[in-house]
Amino acid sequence: MVLAPLLLGLLLLSALWNGGTAEKEEEIKPDQPFSGPLPGSLPADHRPFFAPHSSGDQLSPSQTGRSHPAHTATPQMTSAASNLLPPVAFKNTIGRIVLSEHKSVKFNCSINIPNVYQETAGISWWKDGKELLGAHHSITQFYPDEEGVSIIALFSITSVQRSDNGSYICKMKVNDREVVSDPIYVEVQGLPYFTKQPESVNVTRNTAFNLTCQAVGPPEPVNIFWVQNSSRVNENPERSPSVLTVAGLTETAVFSCEAHNDKGLTVSKGVQINIKVIPSPPTEVHILNSTAHSILVSWVPGFDGYSPLQNCSIQVKEADQLSNGSVMVFNTSASPHLYEVQQLQALANYSVTVSCRNEIGWSAVSPWILASTTEGAPAVAPLNITVFLNESSNNLEIRWTKPPIKRQDGELVGYRISHVWESAGTSKELSEEVSQNGSWAQVPVQMHNATCTVRIAVITKGGIGPFSEPVDVAIPEHSRVDYAPSSTPAPGNTESMLIILGCFCGFVLMGLILYLSLAIKRRVQETKFGGAFSEEDSQLVVNYRAKKSFCRRAIELTLQSLGVSEELQNKLEDVVVDRNLLILGKVLGEGEFGSVMEGNLKQEDGTSQKVAVKTMKLDNFSLREIEEFLSEAACMKDFNHPNVIRLLGVCIELSSQGIPKPMVILPFMKYGDLHTFLLYSRIESVPKSIPLQTLLKFMVDIAQGMEYLSSRNFLHRDLAARNCMLRDDMTVCVADFGLSKKIYSGDYYRQGRIAKMPVKWIAIESLADRVYTSKSDVWAFGVTMWEIATRGMTPYPGVQNHEMYDYLLHGHRLKQPEDCLDDLYEIMYSCWSADPLDRPTFSVLRLQLEKLSESLPDAQDKESIIYINTQLLESCEGLANRSSLAGLDMNIDPDSIIASCTAGAAVSVVMAEVHENNLHEERYILNGGNEEWEDVASTPFATVTAGKDGVLPEDRLTKNGISWSHHSTLPLGSPSPDELLFADDSSGDSEVLM
């Protein structure tokens, strides 16, 4: 009976409890159903709730506001009771996942938590022992039921990378106990990945070296193939890592490695293996500062040859031709690129060059430059000093010998004489100065019964040198009668007579020496020329006919000694000039094969003519070369046309070793070449406009000259604006026949050897097989017309020399200048026909140009016809030595200063076979003026008349002015050469040799 009420109470409490739990479950159901799959152990009608989270921020049921009923209704359990709870563990995972790179992957871990557990934490993801915080996306889902709650943690990676490889686990804390899931291994497979690639190295020629390549998977294994210059080195692969041993190389090569696995292959970067060579010569050698005994040399190191420069050597030698030629060598470190050369003589000229060394060897020396030391104080005192007392004049006579010129260290100004007089208790110090020509002096006696100490020093503009060793002289008591200032000394002074007699004897001796030297010189000449004169002829002092006969005989003997044929000797009678009639002056310019010198040629009437003399540099000439040289001179002597340069003569000079050296004598033209004239019209600070009528006149002049040469079967082969000269009346004449040849058989000439040629002026058929015809000169004339129309621009801007043949072969030609008439461009374009037979002759070209010139109106007035302010040749001496013009590229040939007819190879041309591309070369433009050219500018052209209706062509040079004054290269993405119409880009067209 007692238990019945108790059981009834328990049943009532149980009913109340179940009702409260159901009501709580009704509150925590989510509003939206779960769309994903349900755990297999849960009823299908359960509605879970889930919480997305990142960085391990897991939400427990209590945190989401949807706690399980057991968590709110179950009373607190004691520690002893918690130990009796059933164990909690994660369900088994998928274990291992293998997939390829860039794929997506999802995996999860799940756990059931009974209601009896009150304290639970969220699930966190761990990879390789480190908790994942914020780097990946995960979602935690909760599925509550009557017995507890099921928790599923989803983890996803959208595009897996190799870095996602690893072991993933879930962790959770339940009642302060950590629960860990089984690991999920994720393996990402893909192409091999390089952990070490080959590296570029610089090696010595034929020396072994190693290259290393290492790559990893997964999948493994990874096999390595080596590639050299796009060809496999090993037929059988090697397992990674692989080391390739190369026995040695003789030239540069590119190596790479291929890594293969089941997914494919990966190719490493290509590395270049460079062969160490000797360095290039230093460039830009300059003298930064000079003193009396030192010079400061600077230079820019050349290419190091893939090996660091170790040290440099500065070589210095005296520039004086009379010096012994000894070279002083100064070694210094490679950096800094400066060195002060000391222990030099003052006021002296030196030649300086620099060479540098790496581990392979020494570079070639840089071009020699000239350095001069300044004037300094003398290094020595006068020599042989003697002092004696002249009692008759009461003076001290002091004599000395001048120090050696090389020890004077400057221009001698005079001497300073210091004389100190000392007597008992008295001392007086005086000094005198003597002019530079003196070697003796008189000093009045200042004291008697005293001692005079004399010292002498040399004076130059650089200062006063050291005094000589002192010379003492005793002055005795004075016992003679003092004369008044107006008195004369007593007679009997024989020393003055001795001086006069000595001077007379000296003059007689000098005259005798001069006479003997002239006699010896005459005898040497007679011996040299084979005794051309009889004894009677040699007695004639003034007889022009006899001297002329002597010259002809000397020429005949010289030609006979050279072995020249008799027929050629007859042709050269009026061409070869006696060497004694030619006086050489300064050097105007130097080329690779010759130099141009200023000279004076004596005429028959006793006057002299200023000429230009072109000499050949070679030290030795074969008989065939001499005959070719003289034969061409004999042919060109007959040229008689106002638009063709005239040959004045040829001279054969015998060196001290008896080697004949030919020289060509040509008219001296101070106004220079046509290219320079046109260039200055465009690049001056205030550009000058040249009327179109004047430009056409230039073209007509050249066409007339070439028509004359063509009619005489002469090929020029180097026709360009730089080889056309301007006479004093501004008439253009064709010059520089250094490449010209006479053609006798047929109408062509084939060049038999590789020579330097002006590539951008050469016809397409000549570039192909080196065959030249008169139509090849027509092609060059078309390019010259384009030069004139563009006021001196370089043809084919942006196109390199080695690209010219392909450029022309594809039909490209020079574009029409912007201010060029259509009719004029049609004429020049006809000169560039691919078929030489389709090109017009020079006669047709001359007629077309004259007709076009006549159709144009006259220039507006004579004042509008100007001469360009070009510097005179005389004022340009030393121009090539200026450092600011070291990179000058204006296609100016030093030989084009004069009209050259030499048979030697022309300078200022480029080999067609050369394929070097100087991408960093810059082009500089000369600016400057000269008063003499300004005077010429006031004189109109002789052939152009002014008219009231004349129209001055529009000046369009603003586009071709300063914006084109520097060289530009063609980087990737630049316009094609066809679009670069007016770029003044030399691109290595010619080699300027000065």
From Swiss-Prot:
Annotated segments matching region Disordered: 24-77
Signal peptide range: 1-18
GO terms (BP aspect): apoptotic cell clearance; cell migration; cell surface receptor protein tyrosine kinase signaling pathway; establishment of localization in cell; lymphocyte activation; natural killer cell differentiation; negative regulation of cytokine production; negative regulation of leukocyte apoptotic process
Glycosylation sites: 108, 165, 202, 210, 229, 289, 311, 324, 331, 349, 384, 390, 437, 449
Protein name, as recorded: Tyrosine-protein kinase Mer
Single GO MF descriptor: transmembrane receptor protein tyrosine kinase activity
Keywords of this entry: ATP-binding, Cell membrane, Disulfide bond, Glycoprotein, Immunoglobulin domain, Kinase, Membrane, Nucleotide-binding, Phosphoprotein, Proto-oncogene, Receptor, Repeat, Signal, Transferase, Transmembrane, Transmembrane helix, Tyrosine-protein kinase
Chain's role: Receptor tyrosine kinase that transduces signals from the extracellular matrix into the cytoplasm by binding to several ligands including LGALS3, TUB, TULP1 or GAS6. Regulates many physiological processes including cell survival, migration, differentiation, and phagocytosis of apoptotic cells (efferocytosis). Ligand binding at the cell surface induces autophosphorylation of MERTK on its intracellular domain that provides docking sites for downstream signaling molecules. Following activation by ligand, interacts with GRB2 or PLCG2 and induces phosphorylation of MAPK1, MAPK2, FAK/PTK2 or RAC1.
Similarity annotation: Belongs to the protein kinase superfamily. Tyr protein kinase family. AXL/UFO subfamily.
Reaction equation(s) it catalyzes: L-tyrosyl-[protein] + ATP = O-phospho-L-tyrosyl-[protein] + ADP + H(+)
Native source species: Rattus norvegicus
Extracellular-side positions: 19-497
